[in-house]
Design a protein with these regions (language model features):
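Membrane-embedded segments
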Residues: 48, 52-146
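Short, Asp-centered acidic motifs that coordinate Mg2+ and/or phosphate
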Residues: 82-83, 115, 140-141, 157, ...
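N-terminal membrane-anchoring alpha-helices
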Residues: 1-48
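Beta-strand-turn-beta hairpins that frame and shape the catalytic cleft
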Residues: 41-55, 147-161, 252-258, 284, ...
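Catalytic metal-binding/acid-base residues of hydrolase active sites
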Residues: 61, 91, 121-122, 147-148, ...
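Conserved beta-sheet core of the metallophosphoesterase superfamily
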Residues: 202-280
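Binuclear metal-dependent hydrolase catalytic cores centered on His/Asp/Glu-rich metal-binding motifs
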Residues: 133, 137-139, 152-196, 206-207, ...
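Acidic/histidine-rich helix-loop elements
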Residues: 27, 54-70, 90-99, 122-129, ...
């Protein structure tokens, strides 16, 4: 009888130890910011942009890493990017803190020029105009269905930014999302022969980006599938559902590369599992 009780206690202690270890590991994994370095090569990348470094911040959702986001700022700064791109959901519609976001941006823009596009949370935010003006006032380039040229070492590439499709619903313009995005992209690409980099929050529109002939896409939104399962990948992502096709990392199809950031913060689901927050660093390599 005593032996059975000892065995039961031992099993219970083992279960509790495993649960405690999982809790500690998950807590660490939600705060241990990492850098995911990705190299993108193409013969369309001009020689002047070989070695060009782009830091991507996505889906911050008002999160803070260190007081005043010092850890996040240090992580970006240590990787010496040429530019920083923010691919939406900088704020969170459920717990918006404009001061936290703008304080981070004021410091980040001292590291490198910032180019910003919206996500679905900005589209749902009644104070979006205030956010936009705050970003622009400190020098952020806000791209709302716009294209700009980047110059480096005598070469140029075209950077395009798309507003999140939910802004069309907000403005009472109802349209099928892929068709609407395709029309916008084709208009912006009509006269462009440069290597094209697209900032767009939505990875599920990859087929549209391919069909429009975009060279490189920076996206987010999927939060890495929130819970990453060994040998499987992400469990669930907005607008993709269970076992999302585009949840994290580099995807290549035809001549289009898409980088999907796992993001940094959380939103409706307040924690991640096996899915550390990340800053993505893309280094361009010319094959021309």
């Amino acid at each position: 009888m005593k032996t059975q009780k000892i065995k039961k206690r031992f099993v219970l202690l083992c279960v509790l130890a495993v649960l405690l270890a999982l809790i500690i590991w998950t807590a660490w994994g939600n705060t241990a910011l990492m850098v995911n370095t990705i190299s993108v090569s193409s013969d369309r990348i001009p020689a002047g942009f070989s070695g060009y470094r782009i830091a991507q911040v996505s889906d911050l959702h008002n999160a803070e890493f260190g007081a005043g986001n010092t850890k996040l700022l240090q992580t970006i700064s240590e990787n010496t990017p040429n530019i920083i791109v923010i691919t939406g959901d900088l704020i969170d519609m459920n717990h918006t803190n404009m001061d936290t976001v703008l304080d981070f941006i004021k410091n980040a823009v001292q590291i490198a020029p910032i180019y910003y596009v919206t996500g679905n949370h900005e589209a749902a935010l009644s104070q979006y105009d205030k956010l936009k003006e705050g970003l622009k006032s400190v020098g952020v380039i806000v791209l709302e269905d716009k294209a700009v040229q980047l110059e480096n070492n005598g070469s140029t590439v075209t950077l395009i930014g798309l507003s999140d499709p939910n802004f069309a619903i907000r403005n009472d313009v109802f349209d099928e999302t892929p068709a609407m995005v395709s029309t916008k992209l084709n208009d912006l690409l009509e006269s462009e022969n440069d290597y094209t980099i697209l900032l767009s929050h939505r990875p599920e529109l990859f087929e549209t980006y391919i069909n429009c002939g975009v060279d490189l896409v920076f996206s987010g939104h999927a939060h890495g599938g929130q819970f990453r399962l060994p040998f499987i990948g992400g469990l669930v992502a907005p607008n993709q559902g269970l076992f999302p096709k585009y949840d994290a990392g580099l995807y290549t199809d035809a001549n289009t590369n898409m980088v999907v950031s796992r993001g940094i913060g959380n939103s409706i689901i307040p924690f991640r599992f096996n899915n550390r927050p990340e800053v993505v660093l893309v280094e361009l390599r010319s094959e021309s």
